[in-house]
Amino acid sequence: MIALIQRVTQASVRVDGATVGAIGRGTLALVAIERGDGATQVSRMAERLLGYRMFPDSENRMNLSLAETGGGLLLVSQFTLAADTAKGMRPSFTPAADPETGRRLFDALVDATQRRHSPVATGRFGADMQVFLVNDGPVTFLLRCPPDRPPGG
């Protein structure tokens, strides 16, 4: 499982012109589910999304987590993060989970974070979305929770 996380002052996602998810200060996470991902990756990624220390403390050091700040979490599915870009000029999406598995595990990640934190907002799985954000810093990190078995394995 891959998550590209960004510290934001605000973020929202629209589908067909309607806002389906929005947060104020917090974390926008673009999430890709990979082949071989399962409950282990869901649990670990939920823990990392809520616990990753990327917010400033009183001395302006990145010492506080999303859970500690009470900020919002906006989860947006983005299978393209799982692309293999090593060869040629066109990405291969072989490492990405199939849509059914991707939806099931993305929904499980949403549930896992919502049980531990509020507010949590989401985009719409599989939809053509427009994501709007104001990146704070900018601060952006790539989090990985490797699959139990290698993609394609």
Swiss-Prot record:
Keywords tagged on the record: Cytoplasm, Hydrolase, RNA-binding, tRNA-binding
GO biological process entries: D-amino acid catabolic process
Enzyme class: hydrolase
One GO MF term attached to the UniProt entry: Ser(Gly)-tRNA(Ala) hydrolase activity
Xref: InterPro entries: Daa-tRNA_deacyls_DTD (IPR003732), DTD-like_sf (IPR023509)
Signal peptide residues on this chain, from the entry's feature table: none
Residues spanned by motif Gly-cisPro motif, important for rejection of L-amino acids: 137-138
Claim: Cytoplasm is one of the keywords in the record: yes
Keyword tRNA-binding: yes
Top-level taxonomic group: Bacteria
EC number: 3.1.1.96
Pfam families: Tyr_Deacylase
Entry's Gene Ontology cellular component terms: cytoplasm
Location(s) in or outside the cell: Cytoplasm
Catalytic activities: glycyl-tRNA(Ala) + H2O = tRNA(Ala) + glycine + H(+); a D-aminoacyl-tRNA + H2O = a tRNA + a D-alpha-amino acid + H(+)
Domain notes: A Gly-cisPro motif from one monomer fits into the active site of the other monomer to allow specific chiral rejection of L-amino acids.
Role: An aminoacyl-tRNA editing enzyme that deacylates mischarged D-aminoacyl-tRNAs. Also deacylates mischarged glycyl-tRNA(Ala), protecting cells against glycine mischarging by AlaRS. Acts via tRNA-based rather than protein-based catalysis; rejects L-amino acids rather than detecting D-amino acids in the active site. By recycling D-aminoacyl-tRNA to D-amino acids and free tRNA molecules, this enzyme counteracts the toxicity associated with the formation of D-aminoacyl-tRNA entities in vivo and helps enforce protein L-homochirality.
Subunit field text: Homodimer.
UniProt-listed HAMAP family: Deacylase_Dtd
Similarity comment: family membership: Belongs to the DTD family.
Annotated protein name in UniProt: D-aminoacyl-tRNA deacylase
Natural source organism: Methylococcus capsulatus (strain ATCC 33009 / NCIMB 11132 / Bath)
UniProt lineage: Bacteria, Pseudomonadati, Pseudomonadota, Gammaproteobacteria, Methylococcales
Gene from which the chain derives: dtd
